[in-house]
Amino acid sequence: MNGHKGHLTRRAWLIRVIKGLAGLGAFMIFPRLNPVQATETIPAPERRESIGETFANESMVFTAGFFIFPHAGDAEISLVPLYEKGRYQATISGKTRGIIGFLTRHREDTHISELVENEKKDRFICIRLIRDTKIGNDHTIKIFEMDYQNRKMTVRRIKGKRESVHVKPIPPGVIYDDPLTAFYNFRFGTYGPVRYGKSYKIDTIPGKKVKHIFLHVASKKETEEKKKNLSIAKKVNYLVYLRIAPEIIKSKKGEIEGWFTPSLIPLYGVAKDVIFFGDVKGKLVHLERG
């Protein structure tokens, strides 16, 4: 069976299974977290002297779902200080749950970014990125190590007993921000003040066809129009469109829409056209700060 035919067969099979289970939706039992209610006040991070001190020990938990499966998985984003001052580890980890976990062989994804602050302490720079994927008994690790002094990036891919290593040049003056690094830099104002209608083009680790992360903050008019039917309408202030490498979120175009509070806490988002599942919706259910 060739790859294309296999892809279609798996998709058709998954659609049939989901349709067959539609009548059981009311009886599905998934583990739940206490949600951050729309009526609650979402505290802003206390802006401190440096970007690291501002977000250190912040943890966000999201629940994600689609169609009749409102809780198909969980994801957590966290930032912790490391052994050396000015060095941090940012992590995003996600796991499918329940029947979707069974159908996806309990897929687990973990992205770890080792970050250092720049001299002004107003920007994170990723010096090592680890992408770890487990699907059933399959385990793949991809490691990117950035050496900005010598302008080179070492890429290691480990799958089972097989390992490959490639060294690629980093163009002069370029700093690669992976999506996790960009998440904190954007919220801190590293790319400039967040304004309605503003767009950002951010250099990122080159993917198959992507060399940049694109961010766009919707206009005030568009934001007000689109949030009319949101239960969290009074808590969100910005609608942000994000485009990253499609292979990272396994979608057609790598497009994400996110709703942020005035202090840039993400409350709700949609990953568009995820393969097999369509639009996957996520909401913040737990927030902690150190």
Predicted regions, residues:
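Acidic, serine/threonine-rich low-complexity disordered tracts
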Residues: T39-Y148, G192-G290
